[in-house]
Amino acid sequence: MSQLVWEIVKNNNAFLVKNNGVAFTTDPFSVTGRNTQVGLGFTHRHGVALKGGAKQAIATSLRKNQSHKVKKTGTIEAETLTVKGGVQRVAKVIRGRFQSKGLKQFALKKLVNFHRANVRAQANLKAESKAKKN
């Protein structure tokens, strides 16, 4: 089923961004960020979207597998988990969610990049607040 959906949306979808001949995607459930059949989150049953929270809480949106329900067009069913306790717990949730080793690796890589960006942002905020105090 996902092959049929990919053939329909590969050249025209709302998340498609082309830059210097390379096709990227802004799909929140994408695990690679590239416009490929493997990378698009809305064409597969599994996907993960990460959002930062307060005090090391990461809101993890997991795409639901609801093939038995009639789907409305234009909607993506997702459940949101707020995982407290750091990156290792979110990694455990992701490892339990994905069956394919390749997709699991891409999702874990997305988590690592997200965590690194959050650490840098928090360090920059601390440096700015120290500079304002002095």
Curated annotation (Swiss-Prot):
Pfam families: Ribosomal_L28e. The keyword Ribonucleoprotein applies. One of its GO terms (cellular component) is ribosome. The keyword Membrane does not apply. One of its GO terms (biological process) is translation. GO terms for molecular function: structural constituent of ribosome. InterPro entries: Ribosomal_eL28 (IPR002672), Ribosomal_eL28/Mak16 (IPR029004). It comes from the Eukaryota. Keywords: Ribonucleoprotein, Ribosomal protein. Belongs to the eukaryotic ribosomal protein eL28 family. PANTHER family: 60S RIBOSOMAL PROTEIN L28 (PTHR10544). This is Large ribosomal subunit protein eL28.
